Swiss-Prot record:
Cofactor note: Binds 1 Mg(2+) ion per monomer.
Gene3D superfamilies (UniProt xref): HAD superfamily/HAD-like (3.40.50.1000)
Cofactor: Mg(2+)
Gene name per UniProt: Ctdsp1
Segments for region (Disordered): 1-33
GO biological process assignments: negative regulation of G1/S transition of mitotic cell cycle; negative regulation of neurogenesis; negative regulation of neuron differentiation
Site feature location: Transition state stabilizer: 152, 190
Name of the protein in question: Carboxy-terminal domain RNA polymerase II polypeptide A small phosphatase 1
Taxonomic classification: Eukaryota, Metazoa, Chordata, Craniata, Vertebrata
Organism: Mus musculus
Amino acid sequence: MDSSAVITQISKEEARGPLRGKGDQKSAVSQKPRSRGILHSLFCCVCRDDGEPLPAHSGAPLLVEENGAIPKHTPVQYLLPEAKAQDSDKICVVIDLDETLVHSSFKPVNNADFIIPVEIDGVVHQVYVLKRPHVDEFLQRMGELFECVLFTASLAKYADPVADLLDKWGAFRARLFRESCVFHRGNYVKDLSRLGRDLRRVLILDNSPASYVFHPDNAVPVASWFDNMSDTELHDLLPFFEQLSRVDDVYSVLRQPRPGS
């Protein structure tokens, strides 16, 4: 495996552009993913460069092949088991990892919160991980309010040990990695209809619009985070999530016009 295929993340430059996904893999002249070094391989959700966003859909899981075709007679197999008793009445919140909760780098960082060894093709690389400000209080409270699911387009060999260290409270009831994404038109998309939950009671928190292009009405967008230790985004979002935790249908809130939209 090329070491550039383990972590899915976006750069600061991509974060400033319109609808840029994590680790854009699409070339104007080729459908093949282009190599972008170690980070792209470990950390990778990509964005569409062509056309309008896909419409939201609901119902049975949409299993999309790489060529965009929907296979016929595909048996329904959901990504999540049935909710535990303590979560049966809670909304399910899908939470992204890279640039949402943490930022990771292969370059040494003096103030890294975690250093994760990742083996790629027989070589161990050190991944330096910074925690986003307020992530601890955020995860603790979210775990109390919701059925939380970590869903990342990065590979488990990197993301799983990060989650072990990050989630001190067991907020994440499940963890989903790149193999659970739908690879569609050059993008890793998180298809919420495959979770096995009522979409009226599903939220996704992600810094990449490409990740939730199938279900934009379920999204709570969050700004990409890299290293600004004065960032308050997660802290500022908690009151909104407190409100959402009490509704019967998330669309009753998320489909309303939002300030600045």
